[in-house]
Amino acid sequence: MSVANTTAASQDACYISLLGLAEYFRTSQPPNIKKCIQCLQALFTFQPPSKVEARTHLQMGQVLMAYTCNIDLARRHLEQAWSISEPLMNFDDVKFDTASLLAQLHLKTEQSPHAKAMLRRAVELSQNNVYWHCKLLLQLSQIHANDREYSLASDLLAVGAESAEEAGATYLKVLFLLSRAMILMIERKTNDVLALLNSAGQIIDNNIPNPHQKEYLKVFFLVLQVCYYLALGQVKTVKPSLKQLQMSIQTIMAPNWPSDESIFGGNQLEMFVWLPKEQLYVLVYLVTVSHSMMAGYMDKAQKYTEKALTQIEKLKLQEDKSILSVFKVILLEHIVMCRMVMGNRELAIREIAAARDVCLAVPHRSLLKRHSAQLHCLIGLYSMSTSFFEHAERQFLVCVNETGERDLKLFANLNLAIIYLRTKRDADLKQILDAVSTENTHTYSSQALMGGFYYVQGLHAFHKNSFHEAKRFLRETLKMANAEDLNRLTSCSLVLLSHVFLSIGNSKESMNMVTPAMQLASKIPDIHVQLWGSAILKDLHRMSKDVQHEKEAYANHVKYSENLIADQRKCVQSAHHELVNWFQGDPPLTSGASLTHLPVAAAAPEASTSSLQASTAQFGQFY
């Protein structure tokens, strides 16, 4: 053996020994990261070949990122690994792993443009390696989506679908198609979403031979289909898809179902999973909560929220993934609205504070940035329901200014319109109704929200004593609400229509409207409609000289009033009530002493329709 060969063999032995030692220290209990890094650093003293040097720099970067806060040193090692590996042939794993990790590091330091540039270069170089090409396309599209650059994200996913098709990777192609449908859904490109879902659905049914992969894709497909219908406010239309989704998730969660690793570990082009099954399980609960709330089943929504939150806490104990915080915030946002409908506003403000805490706990305020507008909207609803109208107005205006989501903006504007109506600001009311009408004439918004728009116009007409016009708008609302089983919108419309008929002296029609309104309101349950309806019933029974029923209606009205007043006192004494004063920056922490000031508006409402204000209306979803 020559001296050169002996030296090379000796060096190889050193590399292997040092790598083995480094791995030993890394996997020790507890890990000894300092010694692990020292072993990897020692490799460089042997002036190793380029590929060994690049791999070692990558390993250093991985260890520093995973176990230390030394981001700068991690970046230097990864940049060194990239500069060495970029021109090397047949070295894809190190080259593209480095690019992927560098992009993650840039995101950690809030340098999204650097992350995109890095990945664009890697995508360009990876065209002959389908696995890495698709993986990097997914990563890059995710960053564009997070930055709300949806068209760019969509284009990249279309490229991924083509690449997967050329490679004969049908499972991967469907993943790209469904991911693109999700982006198009955010962009509200309704027709494009339908076309993609139909295309993906046919492939899932006919071209995915592996039954386990097929079921996973089916869950992804059904989640999107359910979200699509819910975004359009089609609560009745969505029921068959939701039922199918619930059955599919039960199949996947069954004890005899194989692990994700065994389903997706066989072929490199099938090692892509949208979400692991445990997270899918939470997501199905979430869309079920959304459906229950929109349909007006508050008890169901509460039950499923509690189950989902319990599941999230279990998963957090195993591994605290960032998506679990996203799920938790969205669930809390839903349940807050349910609490307010039921008159539990003190519980609602506590849960708004809990959502705030989840947002503040996520690094770089990334979750707060995404949900700040929703939090302002919820605080606006809370302020409105506790009669802090000035605070409510400011909260809704902040929400409108912060959000780019059309439905959320419409939702906030409709509630602003009700504030202007109740505070007799006719010019502001006209301006906002005209703006809402113009913005939504040529777009297909949620049926629930558009029904809400007609309801507000009916309420406006009622306050102007334009009873014929009020009936016209409310019948349109009822038509939309009944078509899709939007029970809360139906009950609100019926009780207002009853009040319209009462105002024009048609007690028979008024009774015909208020009776089903109260039945629905007790099922939901909606304390505001019950309060309003009981006042109407009291007047109707007084007019018909039915003393016994008049007494019952009055007793019910007093009961609902007292419940709301007691809850109001709790609200304004809660430390979390201070959130009504948050209008910019980070929301304040509210664990201090309770507040003691009571607003004038907390006085008991009179049990008479002549003095009764229209109840705060919240129209369906805004996610």
From Swiss-Prot:
It comes from the Eukaryota. One of its GO terms (cellular component) is nucleus. The keyword Transmembrane does not apply. Its main location: nucleus. Transmembrane segments: none annotated. Pfam families: Cohesin_load. This is MAU2 chromatid cohesion factor homolog. It comes from Drosophila grimshawi (Hawaiian fruit fly).
